[in-house]
Amino acid sequence: MAASSLEQKLSRLEAKLKQENREARRRIDLNLDISPQRPRPTLQLPLANDGGSRSPSSESSPQHPTPPSRPRHMLGLPSTLFTPRSMESIEIDQKLQEIMKQTGYLTIGGQRYQAEINDLENLGEMGSGTCGQVWKMRFRKTGHIIAVKQMRRSGNKEENKRILMDLDVVLKSHDCPYIVQCFGTFITNTDVFIAMELMGTCAEKLKKRMQGPIPERILGKMTVAIVKALYYLKEKHGVIHRDVKPSNILLDERGQIKLCDFGISGRLVDSKAKTRSAGCAAYMAPERIDPPDPTKPDYDIRADVWSLGISLVELATGQFPYKNCKTDFEVLTKVLQEEPPLLPGHMGFSGDFQSFVKDCLTKDHRKRPKYNKLLEHSFIKHYETLEVDVASWFKDVMAKTESPRTSGVLSQHHLPFFR
């Protein structure tokens, strides 16, 4: 591709990034607006503490509030119009109606409880993202502490699609130990609430806490969990995640490692994704940035394999591999024009780990392995059977390091919707 043509393509992608960022800021502002002019849902959730302090332990969740060191924005790409818009809107409404029939219950520890939103005690905000906010809450009937993702029902088709996709995937994935579990949902006229298991923190925040690399033995167990989660999504539900990155990988003090955030996942048709909407530019595979055949911009699960490879390099080295980039334009250009990142030889990584990452970051997607091949790799086989005390390592890191600071945190006196 000629340089001028490439620059034009990347400039268009960057323009779409900026547009998406404006939309994201608008959605967050909508959620955080506490002015009297905006009607409020009639939710009365008493706060655990009226002192205005945030719960110190509420750090992680299916959403992730701490911004990474370099802004990594959601990239909105042109979508192929294979479904009539009106039919798609009808399908969204039908799926929402189906899910609404299942609301009003929480299933925790194998027990099903009838519940409503007022049965939850708000312990404070855990974070906010493009879709809304996540709250730490206590289920009064049992005392269980859970994470509750709140998303506004704005009427915007794309936002509703994200809500539905996230709901659909987590509700169906109850039998996968490597995907964050959903306890139930509550739907009001203005909001959708998804009750999730409370995890400790995400890999992105762990990297920030440690201010350096995560050990290979931990990344080995993490790789096994994430590859199996992605393989499960593809084989069981025909879904591609499309947003694999450290902030969507959760860990907890029990040593569990799970994948989360399925709002921009896509359905696979003949094993290929037919839409190009959404994704994080920093982890996007070359074939998604610049499709080999622009008239058929299909891609498959190997795009997520690339994202996993970039994530592993970042976590293993403590640095994002495409350094010194001030804009997403620069990152996208480097992904297309430079050789793929590798694990540096001087940091003591095993040959199996280096080989696995190299396979994931094969630039030609046709030669990049799929999940079934990755599961046969000696790196995966080794860490499938090796005993690693992830729980003790996790608790040690959390005890000896400080939580990454977040800006613009609201005190409990200003938690919207829960007065």
Curated annotation (Swiss-Prot):
Enzyme nomenclature, EC number: 2.7.12.2
PTM-bearing positions, type Phosphoserine: S271, S411
UniProt KW keywords: Acetylation, Apoptosis, ATP-binding, Coiled coil, Cytoplasm, Kinase, Magnesium, Metal-binding, Nucleotide-binding, Nucleus, Phosphoprotein, Serine/threonine-protein kinase, Stress response, Transferase, Tyrosine-protein kinase
Region (Disordered): 18-77
Entry's localization field: Nucleus; Cytoplasm
Sequence ranges assigned to domain Protein kinase in this UniProt record: 120-380
InterPro entries: Dual_spec_MAPK_kinase, Kinase-like_dom_sf, Prot_kinase_dom, Ser/Thr_kinase_AS
N-acetylalanine modified-residue sites: A2
Cofactors: Mg(2+)
Post-translational modification: Activated by phosphorylation on Ser-271 and Thr-275 by MAP kinase kinase kinases (MAP3Ks).
GO BP term (any one): response to osmotic stress
Regulation of protein activity: Activated by phosphorylation by specific MAP kinase kinase kinases such as MAP3K1/MEKK1, MAP3K3/MEKK3, MAP3K11/MLK3 and MAP3K12/DLK.
Function: Dual specificity protein kinase which acts as an essential component of the MAP kinase signal transduction pathway. Essential component of the stress-activated protein kinase/c-Jun N-terminal kinase (SAP/JNK) signaling pathway. With MAP2K4/MKK4, is the one of the only known kinase to directly activate the stress-activated protein kinase/c-Jun N-terminal kinases MAPK8/JNK1, MAPK9/JNK2 and MAPK10/JNK3. MAP2K4/MKK4 and MAP2K7/MKK7 both activate the JNKs by phosphorylation, but they differ in their preference for the phosphorylation site in the Thr-Pro-Tyr motif.
Name assigned to this protein: Dual specificity mitogen-activated protein kinase kinase 7
The organism of origin for this protein: Rattus norvegicus
Gene responsible for this protein: Map2k7
